[in-house]
Amino acid sequence: MSNAAPRPLDGITVVSLEHAIAAPFCTRQLADMGARVIKIERPGSGDFARGYDERVRGLSSHFVWTNRSKESLTLDLKRDAARGIMQRLLEQADVLVQNLAPGAAARLGLSFEALHEKHPRLIVCDISGYGVGGPYQDKKAYDLLIQSESGFLSVTGTAEEPVKAGCSIADISAGMYAYSAILNALLLRQKTGAGSRIDVSMLESMVEWMGFPMYYAFEGAAPPVRAGAAHASIYPYGPFPVGDGGTIMLGLQNEREWRVFCAQVLRQAELAEDPRFLGNSLRTANREALRALIVEAFSGLTVQQVTDRLEDAQIANARVNDMAGVWAHPQLRARERWSEVGSPAGVIPALLPPASSNAFAPRMDPVPAVGQNTDQVLASLGYAPEEVAQFHAQEVV
């Protein structure tokens, strides 16, 4: 697809007071779709996610993941001159996104209520741990804390202890809902002509994802047990060791697959009629006995041999990849899902957005250095070179 094809959000300007993951993940997706995203950062240090690690040639892995295709503008919003720049910026903006500490945006005069009269078409998206209102609205919130508060940890891990997800799923979920809500607000503005306020709670985003375990524990019923990497209520569905030291992940969904699995994979057709395993509920209740039988059947086989049997039987399966395996994944390569973007550390690989379109190519522009675009953004707002120089001298930017 030609990069010249128009993108859905061409002409949309987003200003973001963002840090960490939730808001940057939201706005990076807006940038992918063509929006101009101006990222407001602290002069000197920038977004504190820049300092999380130095794994990407000296850059932070979190930061390069969530900040491509953005412009970095440094502003010290404690200074009057910087707040004046911000107001001028908002005159040209369609969307303001912020995930500052609770109450910080309001103290800066950047709440929807403070801005709506002067900027009636502006969409304001606030992302916070617990949302506005309620006893937790001022409580600090980080990804792991929300995983815990939402009940996610209670159903994740082993029987002995809970385990967090290996990536920032609470931040990601909030960022995804913020992104879709902004698209909805832009569509609504086409009908009403007015901007609107969006309130995204990390807690509520994660609780939405907890629908299955919540309903499983409906009206005081016992919740799903923690089952490690295996499914809590479907069996066999999870990882199994293989004779060559590898691990295979497999999943059965119905009784037809169970019979095929016994006959063609385990090559023990009679096991399908074992009264201990008649139906998923009994297989789940007797999972330890069934697991021992499966492990024994796989003990003389390699991962490839087990995979071949599962494929021939059309039983869903997967290898347990590490990160090197994902970088080299043949499916991603075959579908040409890797692109490249610039960065302060040079050109780096970047995964294309998962939803590909035949109508346009996503925007894949560089990850900015701190304040890299400050002078250009100020010039686009009408500030003369001598004014820009004065802002630098006064440490406004």
Question: Which residues are covered by each model-predicted region?
Answer:
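Aromatic-enriched alpha-helical interface/lid elements that frame and gate functional surfaces
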Residues: P236-A313, N317
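Glycine-rich beta-alpha junction loops
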Residues: G44, Y130-G131, M202-V207, D244-G246, ...
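N-terminal helix-loop segment corresponding to the beta1-alpha1 unit
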Residues: M1-K191, A369, D375-V397
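Conserved Rossmann-fold dehydrogenase catalytic segment
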Residues: V132, A159-I169, Q190-M206, V225-A232, ...
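Terminal low-complexity tails and localization/encapsulation signals of metabolic enzymes
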Residues: M1-T13, P241-G243, G325-V397
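Oxidoreductase and adenylate-handling cofactor-binding alpha/beta cores
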Residues: G175-G195, E208, F212-E219, C262-Q268, ...
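Short Gly/Pro-enriched turn/cap motifs at secondary-structure boundaries
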Residues: F63, A227-A232, G238-P239, L250, ...
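Conserved PLP cofactor-binding pocket of PLP-dependent enzymes
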Residues: E311-L332
